[in-house]
Structure formats: C-alpha cells, structure tokens
Amino acid sequence: MGKKEQYDMYSVEMEREGDGAMDVKVMKKNKASKKKEKLESMKKEMDINDHEITVEELEQKYTTSVSKGLKSAFAAEVILRDGPNELKPPKGTPEYIKFARQLAGGLQCLMWVAAVICLIAFGIEESQGDLTSADNLYLAITLIAVVVVTGCFGYYQEFKSTNIIASFKNLVPQQATVVRDGDKFQINANQLVVGDLVEIKGGDRVPADIRIITSQGCKVDNSSLTGESEPQTRSPEYTHESPLETRNIAFFSTMCLEGTATGIIINTGDRTIIGRIATLASGVGNEKTPIAIEIEHFVDIIAGLAIFFGATFFVVAMVIGYTFLRAMVFFMAIVVAYVPEGLLATVTVCLSLTAKRLARKNCVVKNLEAVETLGSTSVICSDKTGTLTQNRMTVSHLWFDNHIHSADTTEDQSGQSFDQTSDTWRALSKVVSLCNRAFFKSGQDGIPVPKRIVIGDASETALVKFSEITVGNVMEYRERFKKVTEVPFNSTNKFQLSIHELQDPLDLRYLMVMKGAPERILERCSTIMIKGQELPLDEQWKEAFQTAYMDLGGLGERVLGFCHLYLNEKEYSRGFNFDTEEMNFPTSGLCFAGLISMIDPPRATVPDAVMKCRTAGIRVIMVTGDHPITAKAIAASVGIISEGSETVEDIAARLRIPVEQVNKRDARACVINGGQLKEMSSEELVEALKLHPEMVFARTSPQQKLIIVESCQKLGAIVAVTGDGVNDSPALKKADIGVAMGIAGSDAAKNAADMILLDDNFASIVTGVEQGRLIFDNLKKSIAYTLTKNIPELAPYLIYITASVPLPLGCITILFIELCTDIFPSVSLAYERAESDIMHLKPRNPRRDRLVNEALAVYSYFQIGIIQSFAGFVDYFTVMAQEGWFPAYVLGLRSHWENQHLQDLQDSYGQEWTFSQRLYQQYTCYTVFFISYEICQISDVLIRKTRRLSVFQQGFFRNKVLVIAIVFQLCLGNFLCYCPGMPNVFNFMPIRFQWWLVPLPFGILIFVYDEIRKLGVRRHPGSWFDKEMYY
C-alpha cells in the first residue's frame, strides 16, 4: 500500500473513531493537500495520446464505433462514472463569512474593543447616576459606524469579483448532435460522455474535446485557447505530437466556423482543456496586492503601538491611583487617539480618484488596489494578438518581377512602392481578386475600406481589402469575370482554385486562378511572369523564389503564392462541365504570378509604449500561442527585442557555428517555444529569465503561461499579465495584476482580470503604470500628513494622566479631526502632480520601498508632530492663564477640577468656579487645542505637496483641490466654533479671535523647517542626511 493510500485510510479511520479535533484536523490537512496536488497536476501539460493512435485503437479504447457510436446503455454507465459534461464550480465561502472578515481586520478589532469599553464606561457612569455627558456613548456609536461603513465598502469591492467559473459556462453549448445505437439525434450537451460519436457544423460550438474522424472543409476558431488569430483546419490527419497543435483534435467550447466534421469524444467537463483552464483560473491567485500588504504592515505597526501606549497609560494610571474604570477609559482614549480612523477612507478615496482618471483614459479598474499594483509592476507578460498587434491580418509585402515591394494599405496609395500599371501586377491582382471567397458586408459604401466588415477568414479579408484599395470595386470586378466553379482550400491539396469566364465576350477562353502554400503553388507551375512575359521556370527563377520566400517568412509573415492559366478554348469550350471531384482540368503547367505576405501588424502606439517601459525599468516579455518566427518578428518590430540584440540562433548563424557552441550568456534575447519549455525544469526557466533580459515565449499553452508568471514572481518581480483569451485567464488570475482586453477579450479573461483596457491598447498600460506610481507617491504624502496628528492627539492624554491637568482635548474632538477636518486635505494630495518624471525611475522594491518607512514615521511623529503639540499646549495654557488659571496652578489640578460636587474651586486670582463653569472652560480648551491643530495642519498639508522639491518649485496653487480643502478646513473650524448649539452637542465653544493667532508662529516654523530639510536633501543626495530625512 502506498504512502498516500495509507494516509487516506488513516483519515477515514479517525473519522470513524470520532476522535474530536484530531479527526477534523487530519481531514482538513488531507483535503488541502489534495487540492494543492490537483492544482499542481492541472499546471502540467495534458498527457494524452488519443491523437496519435489509429481509429481502430480509439474504438477499442472507448468501446465505441465510428459509424454507430456508443450503445445507450453503456453511455448511461459512463455518465454515472464520470458525471455530466459540465464545469463544476468550486466550493465558495459563504457571504456572511466574507462580510464578517471585513469587520474583523487589525484596525477594526481595535476599534471594536474601544467601542465596547466606551459603552461599558457609559453604562457604569449612568448606573452610578453621575452627572456626565454622553461623550462615551457618542464615541462608541461613531466607532461602530466607521467600522461597519468601511466593512460594507470592503465587502462590496470583494463581491464585485464574480465567480470565474460562471464566465466559462457561457462557452458551453446547450445542444449537441450525437450518434448512439446507429441513430442520430440531439441531446443536451451535458449528457455527452467519453466515446460518444458527435457531429459539428459551421456555427456550432464543439461540445467536448473530440478526435476528428471525418471532415469536410472544417475550420475552427482556436484564438481564445491558443492565441492563433487564423482559423485552424480540423481534419483526421495526425500532424503534430502536441495535442494543442495537431489537426485531428477539436476542443470543447471552440467555434466551428465552416465545414462539417464528425468525431469521438475523448474528454468531457473538467477533464477537457477548457475545464482544466477553468480549474486553474479559479484555483490560483487571490494573493494580496502590494498596497494591501503595505497597509496591513502599517496597520500592524499602528495597532501594536496603540496597544502598547494604551496599556502603558493604563498601568501608569492604576499606579497613580485612578480607578480601574477610569484607567480603562484612558486606555480607550489612547487607542482612539492613536488609531487613524480616517485612514481606510483616505486610501479608498485616493485609489477611487485614480481609478476614475484611468477610466477616462480607457482603463477600467475592477479592483481598486490594482491601481497602485500597476505602478509597482516590474515585469509585463504581454499577449501578442490584439494587444501588441491590431488583431487583423494586413497585406505587408509583395514579390513579383523579382522584387520585394512594401504594400501601402492606405486608401490614398501615396506610399505604394511598385508600378500599378505593370502587366505582372495586373495579372497578380486579377488572381488575388478572383481567387477569393471573402466579400464585403452590404451597406458600407461610406466607410473607409480598412474599417469595413468582411465576411471571410483573416487572410482572405486582408487580400480583398488590399484589392479594393488597389484595383477598385472588387465585387464589380468579380462580376465581369463570372465564376464557373471552384475548389475550396483543403489541408491535403493546400491550394484554392476557381475558374472564370473572361470579360471580353469575343474571348471564349476560361481563366483558372489559384492560390495557396507557395511551395505547392510553385511545383504546379512551369512558367513565371516577369515584366508581363511568361518565361520558363528554370533553376534561376526557383532560386529567386526561394530567396524571396525565406526573406518574407523570416519576417514572421504569412506567405501565399499565386498563379493562373488560360484554358484552351477548343478543349474547354463554353459550357464545359468542370468536375471538381475528378479534376477534369489541368492543375499543373500554370504560370506563377507572385507572392503576397500578410501579417497582423503592431499597433502604432506600441513601440513607443515599450520604450517607455524600458525607460521606467519595466521588462516586457511576450507570451503568445503563435509561431516562434512570427512572435520574434513582432517582438523585434515593437522593441521587446531591441535593435542589435541577438538570440543564440542569431549568433550561431552569424558565426556559422553550431548552436551548441554558442555561449548562452552572449545572447541578450531568447525565443523559447512551448516544446522547449515543456522540457525545462522550473529552475532552468528561472535561470533563463535571469540570463536573457529580452524574452519571447511562443506556442505556449495556458498552463505554460501560468508557469512563466510564477517563475517571474519567484525572482521577486511584480508581474502584470495582459490577455484576451480563455487561455489567458489562469495567468491573469495568478499575476499581481491581470489586464484584460475590453473589445476582443473573452468574459473569462475579463472576470479573471483586475483591470480592463477598453481600447485593447498596450499603450494604455503605460498610462496605468504612470498613474500607479503617482498614487503611491501621493499616498505616502497623505499618510505622512495623517500620521502627524497622532502626537498632538496623544500628548494631551499623556499630560492629563502624568501632570494631572484638566483634559486639553476630548475624544469627540479627536473624532472630528479624524473623520471630518483631516479627510479632505489628505484626499486632496491625491491630485498632486508628480515632482519629477516618475517614468524615468526604476519600479519600487516592495520589500525595501515601504509605504510607511522609518524616516516617514520619525519625521511625522517626532518632528512635525512635536511642533504641533507645542502649538496646542501653548494655546491651551494661554487660554487657561487668560481665564485665571496660571500654568503652575493648573498642574495637579485634575482631581479637584473634575469633582462634580466642588462648586467653589478657586483659580489663581481667588475667583470661585462652579463645576458647570469649569466644564465650559474645559470645552473651550478642547476647541482652542483643535483650532491650533487645524492651523498647524494647514502648514503640514502644504509641506506634504513635495518630498524633495521646494513647494515654491511645485507651485502653491496648481493643485486647486488642495486649496479648496484648506478653505473647507477653515470654514468647518469656524462653523464648529461659532454655530449655535455646538456646545450642547459636540462640546465646541466660541473662542476669541486672538486665540486663532497663537499657533501661527508654529505653522510658519513647520513650513520653514521643512523647506530647510528639502534643501538639504537636494543638496546632499545619497548622504546620511538624505537617508534619514527623505521619506
């Protein structure tokens, strides 16, 4: 018995014994390990040989017949064994658990504790009949409201990420045509089983993974699975050892574009290629974003410090002689003062604002935290088709008259490089226009040709558009050359031909035109047209053809050959019955007209975007399902492989030595295909990524895309992945940020992604990177501003407990600071423009460049925070002194001050104060401390505009939102001070004008002090001063 079997049996025995917690623990561990094993097995390439074995072996393997299909009774047994042909959704977390998690984070737990203490304190005070305010009750309600509101928002954000499996279900066909017991009928696709004989036709979705048995011109769209934009022929022939590339396998959910086929089902449900992708997509990912990790790190520090200081003050209070309840209230007050209740709201609003800015630039952000993640990105793994390229085949080059010409596909033809009056071009253009089944959708006369919709495959679409631009109206042209018959392209002949009558009614000959694979077309020709004359196709011209063919193929372009033949009018007179099955007409001895190559061209904005990424220290890796030659050519044209960079193969060709003799370290670029990647270990892949800065992966499977992303992450990279197909969804989910295409993207890709590009343009990602970097800088400024207030909020309680003075600042006042006056200035910093060209800096290192570092904390707490505390205490003691309470007299006064029964407490002048008068004076002190803090925070928000540049260089009033926030802050301060009723509700009092002026010198000091700091940082980059003072 194997080790795993023993383990499984052990878990069952434990369950039977009912040994409590151990039973559950072992079973959970077993379940988790099974899930991990299943996920790892899904990452491996599908290991099947159903495409390699003979039809007879296939029948024997699945107990079926290629003529009669399965027996119904046996099919019923198989469905009981394997289950229905559908994708099973993973077990999800209950919604109430998700919501509960949002209410129980690090900060939230602290705030719950503080709220409970407040309620207990209020309850005890009420039961004792003390004449106190309802501050503790208000505080508890406010804290609970903050936790619930932020929790609801967090839950909403999580809820928006819908179940990945749901999007895959849209790809599953509802009905399928099946043959059982020799009878053909339609059944629900989920009732299909392995071994069933099914039929598909143009317009159907393939109902499972099937081995093709018969085919008539069947073509399928594999683009969402493999990334190949061209329709793929499906036929019974075994053409490749890889099941993804052989022609005799059709995959579950792919669309049959044309033709018909029959096949035997070899996989159903979760065992199909699409099922494995769905399982991978739902099983990977869900890792925390860099900004979430940063905030969690910051929250842990804050929570730890809050508990430490709260506990310290609690112990000190107990030692000094305060009651347990009073000491607990101190603990609560310290927690409230130390915890930045408005931080989560500030971060969320800042990220939302950036997301809105990105939306205006065609980037829709699904996960707010992804905004900053994009700014941290150090590697972009980009799909080719539709992202780097335009996802439309376009004529690129032509070869005729022994010259390669670049094609101009613009309507004005101003850049055309060949003579359009040439006889050879006329002959070639005639073949291109006539030997083509594609046609324009009606009613598009006013639309530019490149934007018109064409009914036909990608290659023929490119050719018919080129003909329309160069020749004129193709449909009218075809009408002049009436088509008599045609032979569609098939995988055996590898050519397409059609026979036409000539437009001259006196010329009774037929014209036969043919196009197809260049080498197959050439072997059917005996002559070649050069400058309008037919010349014998000798070795010289064959060599010229081969050179041109290799040159065009080397550019990664798809090349087609064209030829024609005028049939003898005596042998093939008008009305001749052409038989396309028997081919009762010549298919050799034709005249070769030329070559035309096509390519899916790069988007115009991509090379510049790739260059910006390179400048920003971001590595762009191409990961595509397309051919290595095409992938390399596109990579070179957009700058992923830079000019002058060579692969190992390029170096070997240049030095004329075997590839094995080339030192891999000499090759800056590397192109790895799926077959090579399959043979590589994870260590070898990581080593290749380290060794070659410029990488291209071609012919990759969905599992391999996922492995590439994981390998980049092992190197410590923050990885962004772009994609549009179903095959991209596991990699999109696993990446630190997944970016899906909005136009060409599948639902599965969009659901797996964190961001969607509405214009499918790679250049939009660069905009996102820039905005992501900017928001990290601005969040740093916002948090520095937010943290500064912790010291002036904490210091009053420190002096209150240790020096026993009347409380300078109340909890309700602190909450107004946290949740009202400070929110707007901190959010306004999100609108601050960059200090420098942030796209010329390297991506931040998540392990080193923290959102909150030591320099930021020290500067905010112990420099600016201390100055603000001094401002508050100077104003506090000034107010007390002006009312008759000199500083020396105030020290140690707390117990008498708070004694409700003492109605004749004397001040420094001997004046007697009742408890209500003292309470009024205390609320006045709260207000004065609040106002002094507000004045200093105006200076604080101004200095936070920059971290290195002078504020004068950045500009005082360029950030209009910040100016509005400062005005709002001052207006709110005035409203709280002078609005009638505030003393009874929120304990704010009207204060004298001169008390507003006391903190002004401290505000000026903060500004001057920070300008000196920035000057030192700019003057001495890299010095100890820079390291300690630049945050």
Curated annotation (Swiss-Prot):
Keyword field: ATP-binding, Hydrogen ion transport, Ion transport, Magnesium, Membrane, Metal-binding, Nucleotide-binding, Phosphoprotein, Potassium, Potassium transport, Translocase, Transmembrane, Transmembrane helix, Transport
- Residues with the modification Phosphoserine, per the entry, are 950
Show which residues sit on the Cytoplasmic side of the membrane: 2-94, 160-295, 346-779, 831-850, 946-959, 1015-1031
What are its GO biological-process terms?
Answer: intracellular potassium ion homeostasis; intracellular sodium ion homeostasis; potassium ion import across plasma membrane; proton transmembrane transport; sodium ion export across plasma membrane
Tell me the GO molecular function terms: ATP binding; ATP hydrolysis activity; metal ion binding; P-type potassium:proton transporter activity; P-type sodium:potassium-exchanging transporter activity
Annotated catalysed reactions: K(+)(out) + ATP + H2O + H(+)(in) = K(+)(in) + ADP + phosphate + 2 H(+)(out)
- Please tell me one Gene Ontology term that the record gives under cellular component: plasma membrane
- List its EC numbers: 7.2.2.19
Which Pfam families does the entry mention?
Cation_ATPase, Cation_ATPase_C, Cation_ATPase_N, E1-E2_ATPase, Hydrolase
Active-site residue numbers: 383 (4-aspartylphosphate intermediate)
Locate the region Disordered. Answer: 221-241
InterPro entries annotated for this entry? ATPase_P-typ_cation-transptr_C, ATPase_P-typ_cation-transptr_N, ATPase_P-typ_cyto_dom_N, ATPase_P-typ_P_site, ATPase_P-typ_TM_dom_sf, ATPase_P-typ_transduc_dom_A_sf, Cation_transp_ATPase_P-type, HAD-like_sf
Q: What class of enzyme is it?
A: translocase
- The UniProt entry lists the main location of this chain as membrane
Q: Transmembrane residues, as ranges?
A: 95-115, 139-159, 296-315, 328-345, 780-799, 810-830, 851-873, 926-945, 960-978, 994-1014
Gene3D superfamilies (alphabetical): Calcium-transporting ATPase, cytoplasmic domain N, Calcium-transporting ATPase, cytoplasmic transduction domain A, Calcium-transporting ATPase, transmembrane domain, HAD superfamily/HAD-like
Q: How does it sit in the membrane?
A: Multi-pass membrane protein
- Locations listed in the record: Membrane
Q: Residue ranges under compositional bias (Polar residues)?
A: 221-236
State what this protein does.
Catalyzes the hydrolysis of ATP coupled with the exchange of H(+) and K(+) ions across the plasma membrane. Responsible for acid production in the stomach.
Q: Which family is this protein grouped under?
A: Belongs to the cation transport ATPase (P-type) (TC 3.A.3) family. Type IIC subfamily.
Name of the featured protein: Potassium-transporting ATPase alpha chain 1
This protein's species is Xenopus laevis (African clawed frog)
